[in-house]
């Protein structure tokens, strides 16, 4: 009955995310060295931003975004999609299996000329973050501003 409980689950998750970040950094270096993408402006900062987005939705750290992760991402952005639409989107992006897409697939899609829906999704997410509600009491209005 003496079971040992790991009370440091957050520490293990942090280590998992650190390992994932190292793997993604190696892939970013390959893209930085690739002459195909050398003409892109501000490539290092773009790759860093894409890495952060990818890590946000690859919660299990296995290196692939699956249908449920993509569904969660789209719902978070207020653009829910059906299961069939998600399968079609992943099939468009993925170079391997039809159920997931990897980080290199994600980068090729984002940096490629035929950027699809996910590029628009990331753009809309950035716009949504800019519109934060003002905090504190509302500003006083003059009588002329009242309806």
Swiss-Prot record:
Query: Where is the stretch described as Disordered?
Result: 128-147
Q: What is this protein called?
A: Allograft inflammatory factor 1
Q: What does this protein do?
A: Actin-binding protein that enhances membrane ruffling and RAC activation. Enhances the actin-bundling activity of LCP1. Binds calcium. Plays a role in RAC signaling and in phagocytosis. May play a role in macrophage activation and function. Promotes the proliferation of vascular smooth muscle cells and of T-lymphocytes. Enhances lymphocyte migration. Plays a role in vascular inflammation.
Task: State a single Gene Ontology molecular function.
Answer: actin filament binding
Q: Which GO terms describe its biological process?
A: actin crosslink formation; actin filament bundle assembly; actin filament polymerization; cellular response to oxidative stress; cellular response to type II interferon; inflammatory response; microglial cell activation; negative regulation of smooth muscle cell chemotaxis
Give the superkingdom in one word: Eukaryota
The subunit structure is: Homodimer (Potential). Monomer. Interacts with LCP1.
From the UniProt record, report the name of the gene that encodes this protein: AIF1
State the taxonomy lineage. Eukaryota, Metazoa, Chordata, Craniata, Vertebrata
UniProt domain EF-hand: residue ranges:
45-80, 81-115
């Amino acid at each position: 009955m003496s079971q040992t409980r790991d009370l440091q689950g957050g520490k293990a998750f942090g280590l998992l995310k650190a390992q994932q970040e190292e793997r993604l950094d190696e892939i970013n270096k390959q893209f930085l060295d690739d002459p195909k993408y050398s003409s892109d402006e501000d490539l290092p900062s773009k790759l860093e931003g894409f890495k952060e987005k990818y890590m946000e939705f690859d919660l299990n750290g296995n290196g692939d975004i699956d249908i449920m992760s993509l569904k969660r991402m789209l719902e978070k952005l207020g653009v829910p999609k059906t299961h069939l639409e998600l399968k079609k989107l992943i099939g468009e992006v993925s170079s391997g299996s039809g159920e997931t897409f990897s980080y290199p697939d994600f980068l090729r899609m984002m940096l490629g000329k035929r950027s699809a829906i996910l590029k628009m999704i990331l753009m809309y997410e950035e716009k949504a973050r800019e519109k934060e509600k003002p905090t504190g009491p509302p500003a006083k209005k003059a009588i002329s501003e009242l309806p």
